[in-house]
Amino acid sequence: MPRGQKSKLRAREKRRKARDETRGLNVPQVTEAEEEEAPCCSSSVSGGAASSSPAAGIPQEPQRAPTTAAAAAAGVSSTKSKKGAKSHQGEKNASSSQASTSTKSPSEDPLTRKSGSLVQFLLYKYKIKKSVTKGEMLKIVGKRFREHFPEILKKASEGLSVVFGLELNKVNPNGHTYTFIDKVDLTDEESLLSSWDFPRRKLLMPLLGVIFLNGNSATEEEIWEFLNMLGVYDGEEHSVFGEPWKLITKDLVQEKYLEYKQVPSSDPPRFQFLWGPRAYAETSKMKVLEFLAKVNGTTPCAFPTHYEEALKDEEKAGV
């Protein structure tokens, strides 16, 4: 078979897999073909060994796959959340009828919501530097979902690991007390991220990752989809992150970590998030990709298209 035809067939197979991942949100594994095409980058990230963990996949292609990117970045249930996908144009024009509402869909998987609540509680315990017991977690889950506790804990643990780089560690095999292990140390003195406080440094890197994976811009819907999977909802005060809308559209925008702009030529107006100048100054696409790769137990080469883009940016910057 001619070489060009093989390439076309391979590209077609990738597109088919991407469609399947978007529909089923199964964890994508890097294929042999992708490994051959991806430049070797084993030296680009330290301590990132390949893993067969179910949380080890993030979509490979940059085409708009918001659900896949959000679900993979969040590391929780593949249930597509419709909540929080809200345009706040109504704040500027109360008469606007185009903006979708942020109502909570009754059809959402209740286990997903419980795992989100558990993630919120665990982040709070991490913030105050306290261990957590099984009994405390069962109180969050409630009697109604007690029998589903193992599944809920598994989803919450994956979310903590993939998004925030935190692992729950049982103090002893027969005990019921857990402590936290930070898999990704963002407080290294040499790191430009050392000035980021908690929880900013634990949320901003994944947010920058979602924007990068979505083609360097993410719509409100895509950002809310990601946040909803973490148990962060519009209009609800979060015990760790505070009021989420204020955090992402005001605080992080004013600090120039994010930009919040109208999508060009959108009618009715729609808004999107981009990296701000301070994000470009204090980190890079490669660092964000290395972060995502490390917490997923893989390497940046697992995302060949994004890796190539990050490499080009490094070359332009003379890194």
UniProtKB/Swiss-Prot annotation:
* Regions of compositional bias (Low complexity) in chain numbering: 39-57, 67-79, 94-105
How does the record describe its quaternary structure?
Interacts with TRIM28.
Where Phosphoserine occurs, residue numbers? 77, 105
Q: Which InterPro entries match?
A: MAGE, MAGE_N, MAGE_WH1, MAGE_WH2, MHD_dom
Transmembrane feature ranges: none
Recorded coiled-coil stretches: none
User: What is the scientific name of the source organism?
Assistant: Homo sapiens
* Name listed for the protein in its UniProt record: Melanoma-associated antigen B2
Listed Basic residues bias regions: 1-17
Q: Which GO terms describe its cellular component?
A: nucleus
Pfam families in the cross-refs = MAGE (PF01454), MAGE_N (PF12440)
For whether the record's keyword set contains DNA-binding, the answer is no
Q: Does the keyword Methyltransferase apply?
A: no
A GO BP term, please?
negative regulation of transcription by RNA polymerase II
PANTHER family, alphabetized: MELANOMA-ASSOCIATED ANTIGEN B2, MELANOMA-ASSOCIATED ANTIGEN MAGE ANTIGEN
Q: In which tissues is it expressed?
A: Expressed in testis and placenta, and in a significant fraction of tumors of various histologic types.
Q: Which UniProt keywords apply?
A: Phosphoprotein, Tumor antigen, Ubl conjugation pathway
